[in-house]
Amino acid sequence: MRLNDGEVVSLLGPSGCGKTTLLKLASGIEKLQKGEIKLNDKIISSSNTHLSPDKRKVGYVFQDCALFPHLTILQNIFFGMNSKEISAQTNKIQNLMNEINISRLSDSFPHELSGGQQQQVALVRAIASDPKIILLDEPYSNLDSRLKEKIRDQMLHILREHNISALLVTHDPEEAMFMSDKIGVLNNGVVEQFGSPIDLYLRPKSAFIAEFFGEINLFEGSVDGGLVNTVLGTFKCSKKLNKNKVTIVIRNEAIKLYAVNKAMSEIVNENGFIVSPYFGYVMETRLLAGSTLIHLSLKVNQTNYHIHARIPGL
């Protein structure tokens, strides 16, 4: 993986896949056993090289904020900096605190702040030392959904405005897609795919990757030359397949529904869609935020297929 200047890269994956470990290696908290980590093309970690954390110019925002309870907010922000560094960064930090509306909290203590305010302080503290990169370890996991949206939007604007590179750990795909220029999906310590959010969403390399970015439907298919036959219709293959049986992955929002009184040929001619030769039945509908989830039943011979479709609005 490569993180360019000013980019935000997210590490996404299930619990225990190695996301936080990778952050600790990048920060220097843990030592690398194999491979290399470079910062501005200089090796900072390898099997025989280890630059200490204090010399890496890396900011770290922890999941629990890690603010010192006995220090005021301003003391927390400038902790570990000498008088010369504080003098050089004071105007920048004051402007940043004004921008996110926490300057009034300068003399407060961490326990007097809300969870969102503590995260804002943690970000300002990480920026205060003028790092080359900021590492963010699930910074919004303890916030409610509405506050999470507000804080992450605010954080992204700050990173962009100050051209700060960031490496973000999250298990939330929506958060990763919102925040990131690129995403690395980890599984069992291995980066399975690395690319832009749109690449991972539209061109996933596996069903594991596809399912991380939204619920999917799986269908068995039989290969016939350059075609794959399924209960949903016949699909063209983008490459040659050296097997007789495959699995088709289709996202909920890719399934379109039409009333039975509309001719299939009309649907195909209008939209170029692949049309199932079988009729489906609506079993249940559920209104979600901004969309409706529809449970469908498709009966083929003696087999019932349970399918999920998602349509905008009601």
Predicted segments, located by residue:
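Short beta-strand immediately N-terminal to the Walker A/P-loop
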Residues: 9-10, 60
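The feature captures the beta-strand-to-loop junction immediately N-terminal to the Walker
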Residues: 12-14
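ABC ATPase nucleotide-binding domain helices that frame the ATP-binding cleft
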Residues: 20-23, 121
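Helix-to-loop junction immediately C-terminal to a conserved catalytic motif
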Residues: 27
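Conserved coupling/switch loops of ABC nucleotide-binding domains, chiefly the family-specific signature
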Residues: 33-36, 188
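ABC ATPase NBD Q-loop/coupling interface
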Residues: 36-56
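ABC ATPase nucleotide-binding domains
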Residues: 53, 57-59, 63, 67-208
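Non-catalytic connector elements of ABC transporters
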Residues: 227-314
